[in-house]
């Protein structure tokens, strides 16, 4: 439709009004704060799983002298299905800790198969993964999801089948990567089917190649919410720069997560085969400060820790100084 003619005086008025509005928008834009960097990463530690360990976690924060830990991190035993279903009573205490402060995160490691550290042969593992991919074990994960919702922690970060690229656990990926991916995705869909859940599912390999390149195990963006990494100071003699730049190392992990549009995390990290190594400790904490993971949680027991473990005084000093300065 052809528009009606506008008088010159009206056009001048409209032009003036437009200029004023543009200036106002510009002024508002200039006064608006620039996007801030990602907030300081939440931190926590694995200090144990007993009910009393919730207090120990907070004591770690008091020792650091800064903000309290916001990440509570525990594991479900993988010896039998009843424990993978969430039977252990200590979950109640950790759920209560999480509910006490909406800023907190509850991170729960969940094995994918029972007899999780029984060192079963590859053929048995492959058969078990295929059973899982066909739905044989769905009911166990449905029970777990219902328990977590009933405990008031429907937003639990579920670290499912961690360190799958290694050989430690029965839920390892190497014997049948396709079945592993299908089974992992199936568990996620089963748990997401439970009403009122808001779980976040974390895919967490170990740093480096290990037994299989961990990207081969990645089950897909639709079923992964967080890309984690377990990053201990190993093997012996490998410096921090090597840990950054090795194939499937720290730098590759962050690039992978960002390429897939996922936040990243470090649910396990700490000292290991290189002993009391302040260079590693400084390197990891500097990496966190630069990259801003969603959260990081040190394994605070020997041979990994810096607070409960008294064997690493130089690394302890670095951890305390940098974490206190960071105000994590």
Summary of predicted features, one role per range:
Residues 37-51, 263-328:
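Substrate-binding cleft of secreted/luminal carbohydrate-active enzymes
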Residues 2-33:
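Secretory targeting and sorting signals
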Residues 57, 207-222, 275-284:
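Distinct, well-ordered alpha-helical segments
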Residues 90-97, 102-105, 109-111, 219-274:
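Glycoside hydrolase catalytic-domain groove-lining segments
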Residues 58-67, 89-108, 115, 143-153, ...:
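Acidic (Asp/Glu)-rich catalytic clusters
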